[in-house]
Swiss-Prot record:
Uppermost EC category: lyase
UniProt cross-references to PROSITE patterns, sorted A to Z: TRP_SYNTHASE_ALPHA (PS00167)
Keywords: Amino-acid biosynthesis, Aromatic amino acid biosynthesis, Lyase, Tryptophan biosynthesis
Annotated protein name in UniProt: Tryptophan synthase alpha chain
PANTHER family: TRYPTOPHAN SYNTHASE ALPHA CHAIN, CHLOROPLASTIC, TRYPTOPHAN SYNTHASE, ALPHA CHAIN
Subunit structure: Tetramer of two alpha and two beta chains.
Catalyzed chemical reaction(s): (1S,2R)-1-C-(indol-3-yl)glycerol 3-phosphate + L-serine = D-glyceraldehyde 3-phosphate + L-tryptophan + H2O
Lineage, top ranks: Bacteria, Pseudomonadati, Pseudomonadota, Alphaproteobacteria, Hyphomicrobiales
InterPro entries the record matches: Aldolase_TIM, RibuloseP-bd_barrel, Trp_synthase_alpha_AS, Trp_synthase_suA
Organism in which the protein naturally occurs: Rhizobium rhizogenes (strain K84 / ATCC BAA-868)
E.C. number: 4.2.1.20
One term of GO molecular function: tryptophan synthase activity
GO cellular component terms, semicolon-separated: cytosol
Active site: E50, D61
Function: The alpha subunit is responsible for the aldol cleavage of indoleglycerol phosphate to indole and glyceraldehyde 3-phosphate.
Length: 279
């Protein structure tokens, strides 16, 4: 783990509550609004920020996040600007962990070594790259770890006992458990199944296990947070941004505040959840 990530999860464990991990697309609907949203997240209760890297072919994303990526790209967002977004955020917040989430193609085009150096300079703590399996660890995972950036893996309900050790081998920071198969924005999973999955994963790792896909309300966050070390919310935040926009897709007067209000409610859910020790 990076020091920021390690410190944050240790503090949350001491408090006895799960992390609220909030995702939004960098540059949606524009750079300045996106930075305003990012700055508002910690004050509203976000413990970790997942910053989406826009990509033209996001195969694992549902319609809401696909549209967010399209809005960001249309507004001129690039990977370089996404790193700058993190750097600008770091000018006023040196404590909140930032995880970049997206696909390998933009990183490959940028240049792996240059990307990692720029990510470190921007204050990035971790990466989630959804289309790089463990068999391709030499591409980005190993170089990232060597430079001190966490590489966070996704586990799913179909990740069986035989596959799980390979998935977890070079994972650091936390494990992201995708609580159901399919694309982002799916329905809420069965909390009892999530609890069993978290326990199963923890038999193989001491890393925190954060659960995402389908969490949209404070009650959802409370239910999932009862057994997970963290609750990941993405589509609900992206939808909140989308509904706040003007008819021509520009930021509304209340876009930042609308996101902050939603996150404040989600934080109430995670803060009322009681962590169950996964043994």
């Amino acid at each position: 783990m990076t020091a920021r990530m390690d410190k944050r999860f240790a503090a949350l464990k001491a408090e006895g509550r799960p992390a609220l991990v909030t995702y939004f697309m960098g540059g949606d609907p524009d750079y300045d609004t996106s930075l305003g949203i990012m700055k508002a997240l910690p004050e509203a209760g976000a413990d970790v920020i997942e910053l989406g890297m826009p990509f033209s072919d996001p195969m694992a994303d549902g319609p809401a996040i696909q549209l967010a990526g399209q809005r960001a790209l249309k507004a001129g967002q690039t990977l370089k600007k996404t790193l700058q977004l993190a750097a600008d955020f770091r000018k006023t917040d040196g404590d909140t962990p930032i995880v970049l989430m997206g696909y390998y193609n933009p990183i490959y085009i940028y240049g792996v070594e240059t990307f990692l150096d720029d990510a470190i300079a921007a204050g990035i703590d971790g990466l989630i790259v959804v289309d790089l399996p463990p068999e391709m660890d030499d591409e980005l995972c190993i170089p990232a770890i060597r430079k001190g950036i966490n590489f966070i893996r996704l586990a799913t309900p179909t990740t069986d006992e035989k596959r799980l050790p390979a998935v977890l081998k070079n994972t650091s920071g936390f494990v992201y458990y995708v609580s159901m198969n399919g694309i982002t924005g799916s329905a809420l999973p069965d909390p009892s199944l999530v609890s069993g999955a978290v326990k199963r994963i923890k038999q193989h790792t001491d890393l925190p296990v954060c659960v995402g896909f389908g969490v949209k309300t404070a009650e959802h966050a409370k239910l999932i947070g009862a057994s997970a070390d963290g609750v990941v919310v993405g589509t609900a935040i992206v939808n909140q941004i989308a509904t706040s926009l003007t008819k021509d897709g520009k930021a509304g007067a209340d876009t930042i505040q609308a996101v902050a209000t939603l996150v404040r409610g989600l934080s109430t859910g995670t803060r009322s959840a009681r962590l169950v020790a996964a043994e």
